[in-house]
Amino acid sequence: MELKKYEELLISNIKALMSVDSPSGFTHNATELVKKMVTDLGYKCTQNNLGNVVVEVEGEDDTAPLGMSAHLDTLGLMVRSIKPNGDLAFTVVGSPVTPSLDGEYCRIYTREGKVYEGTVISETPAKHVFKDANTHPREAENMVIRLDEVVRSKEDVVKLGIAAGDFVCYDPKTTFTSSGFLKSRFIDDKACAGIFITLLTIFKELGIKPKHKTYLCFSVHEEIGYGGATLPKDMKELLVVDMGCIGDDLNCRETDVSICAKDSSGPYDYDMTTMLVELSKKHNLPYVTDIYPMYSSDAIAAWRAGHDVRCALIGPGVAASHGMERTHIQGLMATVELILHYIQ
């Protein structure tokens, strides 16, 4: 299947999604963007009460609908309190690798619609002042947000309209290299959401019609555990498209599409997983099968919510997950191709 001409489109779609802040609980701007991108391509979509966006793609048969899920929500931070000197204490949204946040530029969104800039730093950031500047723990309770405003006290910050509960979003720093690497935060899972948007174009331009009615689902609470809980109830199968794990004794690299046999919640559907392996072999895709030791997905949330659905999990290999992540266009396009073979 010749798909190389869609690489630039995929890159463009990923960049567009990365440009919009969307930590779990603060995804409205991202869902509005996705709805516009989808409708501009001529598709209809719906959005449920919790915010998931679902695109229904007509199939040759509508008696056994398939679902595919990628999540729009990302990791983030939230203001916990204002310190006496005007720095902000924060709590994490999801599970970022907090030491990797030291020095990150960020935006603070107030409930009145104001946006302020700042930097995530250690409590002891100055090498010329603090003996433990190098060794001070980099956890949420040992770090602060330094506002880029002239503030000297808690009262100064309150006057700006900043309060506990305000979302804090840090820069993804999205970069595509000439060698094909995507370096960015939030590749998990905006890269796969970008794959879904690209698939909709491929369906149109190549005249591809899925064998079964297919729901493309953009979930918005995956990073906090219940993204898949409110996906369509009539799905017979759910293919979760999320990042593949890299590291330790795992097989995956950034250039692969990873097929997950089991994560920390248990095995995925045996028959679906076997079919995905066989499709990868048949079409000579760069694939691996792996066990993800500390991982959960929209499939687990769907099962725990009582969905009677078979589930499998695939995705491009992503290094340094929940930190400064990296994948490769080869792994991304292999994921695209495996999905296309799966739905047909």
Per-region residue spans from a language model:
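N-terminal hydrophobic/helix-forming segments and targeting peptides
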Residues: 1-344
